[in-house]
């Protein structure tokens, strides 16, 4: 015996959204942003390998005060992070000379950092006098690299200060 079964009809709603197509300009902009992000990541990784992982850098940065690194950061920021100018070299040489002539504790602790930065980032030999002016070339990549590196240095200084405070509270 068979019974007829009535089934409800299923309603299917198709929700078609209009597809947004990416323009050529938008595509190029997106690709440039992705490339910039990968460059930033690469700069950070290279900086970590060449400086942060090395004992010499850790020892130099450990003692500098936050006020000194902030001052140095603002000097570079004022120069738009272009380290190719003589102004930065003059600033570093002045800080090293001031440390030798004054008894400022902050400068005394910052001197090794200034010497390290001058030697490894600018190629300055503090034992020799400055003789010639540099030829300044400004590129977006170099400025971006300098800004990222100095931001990483500043962050590492903050890390060292926080670590010191935690260790002193733990004892």
Q: Residues of each region from the PLM?
A:
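Small/polar/charged residue-enriched interaction surfaces, especially the RNA/DNA-contacting tracks
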Residues: 1-171
